[in-house]
Design a protein with these regions (language model features):
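Vicinal oxygen chelate
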Residues: 1-32, 36-50, 73-119
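Short amphipathic alpha-helices within nucleic acid-binding modules
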Residues: 65-72
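Short hydrophobic/aromatic beta-strand micro-patches
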Residues: 7-9, 59-63
Length: 119
């Protein structure tokens, strides 16, 4: 398991916003700062649990998402928000945790470039 980012929900606007209409949210590029912070503003009607929309989460890359989810309380089922990435959210001790499986043979380019491909 490898650290990927910290997602912090906010209702405020922030510099370098990236709109992700297919996800009903706006984010910052977590790769553009040394601490992996990703600001996240969820749009009205975004189809996510309140826990994810209101509580910060930590995200980890895993080699095998299915194995990592075994025995966990899954709150967002595995899905592919962008090319080469499959994610799921679990609930651990009352907090959301994001798990990502990344196909490095597909996942090339910057965070912003890859998300723009999915629009």
């Amino acid at each position: 398991m490898k650290f990927n980012h910290i997602g912090i929900p906010t209702t405020d606007r922030f510099d370098g916003e990236i709109d992700l209409p297919h996800l009903s949210m706006t984010v910052s590029d977590h790769q553009s700062n040394p601490f992996g912070i990703q600001w996240q503003r969820y749009w009205d009607g975004a189809p996510y649990p309140d826990l994810v929309k209101t509580v910060p989460h930590v995200a980890f890359e895993v080699d095998n998402l299915a194995e990592a989810l075994a025995g966990q309380e899954v709150i967002i089922a595995p899905n592919s928000p962008s090319q080469g990435v499959t994610v799921a959210f679990i609930k651990v001790a009352g907090a959301p945790v994001e798990l990502l499986e990344i196909d490095r043979s597909v996942r090339k380019g910057s965070f912003e470039q890859l998300h723009r491909l999915c629009r």
